[in-house]
């Protein structure tokens, strides 16, 4: 577990950020493994999810995460807060130079802006809002099979990659049939597929397909928006008590041991640090199997066959 030397900084609106010593920040950042991708790049296994945080509230959240040691942030045009993220990156110096090189920035194309020309135009706007010269990963947000334009859009993504404005190309919410269609049209597998994944919705067929084709799996809603903390009639809580950690840390550790990239969301500095602090314990084989056994038939979020983040 990490030892912290802290002092508190209060932002307008009541958000309190705890400032941590440089030594502790470096230790937290260094503790997070990198996951090797099929394009030769490597992504920090833990990032900060930024869904459902207003643009005027997101900057101190990002600043707090960076101060806690996060080196991976996950945004999207559809979250409507890229401007606030950009303000945080600029305020902390993570928009340029060595600090920028140390940070993995992901954003996603809005579904309504799919298409070759519209995707290029959208990226220009998004990079401007983020106040960065390049993005580490640009992603298709939903497959929208009812209005499929992923192949055409991917060609725009490749152009951005060739120009050095994007390093890695990924997708979100793609099922095997969508991944195969994209590959048929472009000759490429994405580096990452970001999907809803947590103990009660493990998507084993999707995960197996991704592993077979060298696609890294990234989990959003890694705790089912908190619903899985009490899953299995107290299974998670009992494991947490055994290790003297929180139920959230147990679930996140399960993901880590599965080799999954995770982007837990928290607006609280203490919980942000807690979500990084996953490397002072390990699950036993029996504990890991008990969490595996919690898999169920119901997703917490949207259906990739019907949903669009317009």
Give the positions of each predicted feature:
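N-terminal binding-site loop/beta-alpha segment at the start of enzyme catalytic domains
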Residues: 3-5, 10-103, 223-224, 307-310
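Generic structural signal for well-ordered alpha-helices
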Residues: 32, 62, 82, 86-89, ...
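CE4/NodB-like, metal-dependent polysaccharide N-deacetylase domain
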Residues: 38, 119-140, 159-163, 185
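Acidic-and-aromatic substrate-binding clefts and catalytic sites of carbohydrate-active enzymes
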Residues: 53-56, 76-84, 112-117, 145-148, ...
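Short, acidic/polar
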Residues: 54-66, 115-130, 179, 202
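Residues at the N-termini of beta-strands
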Residues: 72, 134-137, 168, 192
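A short, structured active-site edge motif that brings together acidic residues
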Residues: 99-113, 136-143, 197
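Beta/alpha (TIM)-barrel catalytic core signal, keyed to glycine-rich beta->alpha loops juxtaposed to Asp/Glu
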Residues: 143-310
């Amino acid at each position: 577990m990490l030892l912290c030397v802290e002092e508190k900084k209060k932002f307008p609106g009541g958000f309190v950020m705890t400032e941590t010593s440089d030594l502790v920040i470096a230790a937290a950042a260094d503790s997070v493994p990198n996951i090797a991708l099929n394009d030769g790049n490597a992504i920090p296994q833990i990032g900060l999810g930024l869904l459902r945080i207003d643009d005027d509230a997101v900057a101190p959240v990002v600043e707090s995460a960076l101060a806690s040691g996060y080196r991976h942030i996950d945004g999207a045009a559809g979250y409507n807060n890229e401007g606030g993220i950009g303000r945080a990156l600029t305020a902390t110096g993570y928009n340029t130079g060595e600090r920028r090189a140390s940070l993995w920035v992901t954003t996603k194309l809005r579904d309504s802006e799919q298409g070759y020309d519209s995707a290029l135009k959208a990226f220009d706007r998004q990079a401007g809002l983020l106040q960065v010269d390049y993005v580490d990963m640009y992603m298709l947000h939903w497959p929208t099979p009812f209005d499929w334009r992923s192949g055409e859009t991917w060609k725009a993504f490749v152009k951005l990659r060739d120009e050095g404005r994007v390093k890695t190309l990924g997708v979100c919410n793609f099922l095997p049939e969508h991944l195969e269609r994209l590959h048929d049209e472009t000759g490429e597998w994405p580096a990452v597929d970001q999907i809803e994944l947590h103990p009660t919705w493990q998507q084993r067929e999707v995960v197996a397909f991704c592993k077979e084709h060298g696609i890294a799996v990234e989990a959003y809603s890694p705790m089912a928006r908190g619903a899985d903390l009490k899953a299995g009639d107290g299974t998670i809580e009992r494991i947490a008590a055994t290790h003297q950690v929180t139920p959230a840390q147990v679930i996140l550790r399960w993901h880590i041991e599965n080799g999954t990239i995770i982007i837990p969301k928290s607006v609280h500095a203490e919980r942000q640090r807690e979500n990084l602090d996953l490397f002072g314990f390990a699950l036993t084989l029996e504990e890991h199997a008990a969490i595996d056994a919690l898999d169920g038939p119901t997703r917490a979020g949207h259906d990739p066959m019907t949903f669009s983040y317009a």
